[in-house]
Curated annotation (Swiss-Prot):
Active-site residues (renumbered): 8 (proton acceptor), 130 (proton donor)
Pathway(s) the chain acts in: Amino-acid biosynthesis; L-histidine biosynthesis; L-histidine from 5-phospho-alpha-D-ribose 1-diphosphate: step 4/9
Family: Belongs to the HisA/HisF family.
Gene Ontology biological-process annotations: L-histidine biosynthetic process; L-tryptophan biosynthetic process
Protein name as it appears in the record: 1-(5-phosphoribosyl)-5-[(5-phosphoribosylamino)methylideneamino] imidazole-4-carboxamide isomerase
Primary location recorded for the protein, binned into one broad class: cytoplasm
Domain of life the protein comes from: Bacteria
InterPro entries membership: Aldolase_TIM, His_biosynth, HisA_bact_arch, Isoase_HisA-like, Isoase_HisA-like_bact, RibuloseP-bd_barrel
Alphabetically ordered keywords of this record: Amino-acid biosynthesis, Cytoplasm, Histidine biosynthesis, Isomerase
Pfam families per record: His_biosynth
Record's catalysed reaction(s): 1-(5-phospho-beta-D-ribosyl)-5-[(5-phospho-beta-D-ribosylamino)methylideneamino]imidazole-4-carboxamide = 5-[(5-phospho-1-deoxy-D-ribulos-1-ylimino)methylamino]-1-(5-phospho-beta-D-ribosyl)imidazole-4-carboxamide
């Protein structure tokens, strides 16, 4: 299980939201590329980067920060937020993004999902399944898709998706701990390589996730707020798991 630090970009700053609420955001840095450099120095290998403006269809706002992060860090980068057409996929491929995260498009545009799988290595195509009360949210978590996350996962498995990020939005940004039951059910029901996201507050949370008794081990865990608030030491977490 790998530990994946997160940077969420809003107006070119690193921020964290509380339960996905844009009205409850806290700014942590106006130089997010420096955060990425720090994560690399502390032993991380993969960065979870989210374009929050892009997720709301406010495209291009964070482009400079995304480029600078890609150019200045040795980390592999998985990027999501606003990837809803072939041109965006091609652009991110061109600038060296390692993995593309499709969220809204995975729900609303199965043809784009198929295109991504047909034209890029499966390892590079990740689907974000973001849910609250069992229902998938889209468009920056601001719209209800009406699709249950288990139904979406059934579709993704049939489509050939191998990698997903699952976020329990009710836990995200709360430091209240992960939804262990949900991850256990997913890992025992589906063939995906799963990355957990939402609620991480301590090394104990990471240990609890790594100790889940499942058919497939958890691939990774995303953590953001716990790092920024000093609740979790990244280097220690990486060496302990």
């Amino acid at each position: 299980m790998i530990i994946i630090p997160a940077i969420d970009l809003f107006d070119n700053c690193a921020v964290r939201l509380f339960k996905g609420n844009y009205k409850e955001k806290k700014i942590y840095s106006s130089e997010p590329w420096k955060l990425a450099e720090g994560f690399a120095k502390n032993g991380a290998t993969l960065l979870h980067l989210v374009d929050l403006n892009g997720a709301r269809n406010q495209l291009g706002i964070n482009e400079d920060s995304i480029l600078k992060i890609r150019k200045t860090t040795s980390l592999k980068v998985q990027l999501g937020g606003g990837i809803r057409d072939k041109e965006k996929l091609a652009y991110y491929d061109k600038i060296g993004i390692d993995r593309f995260i499709l969220g809204t498009a995975a729900v609303t545009d199965p043809d784009l999902l198929k295109f991504a799988l047909d034209n890029y290595e499966k390892e590079r195509v990740v689907v974000a399944v973001d849910a609250i009360d069992g229902i998938v949210k889209i468009a920056g978590w601001e719209k209800d898709s009406g699709v249950r996350y288990r139904d979406l996962m059934d579709r993704l498995a049939k489509a050939g998706i191998e990698h997903i990020v699952f976020t329990d939005i009710a836990q995200d940004g709360t430091l209240a701990g992960p939804n262990l039951k949900a991850y256990q059910e997913i890992l025992n029901s589906y063939p995906f390589q799963v990355i957990a996201s939402g609620g991480i507050s301590s090394l104990k949370d990471l240990m609890d996730l790594s100790s889940l008794k499942t058919k497939i081990p958890l691939y990774g865990v995303i953590t953001g707020k716990a790092l920024y608030e000093g609740k979790l030491d990244l280097a220690k977490a990486i060496s302990s798991i």
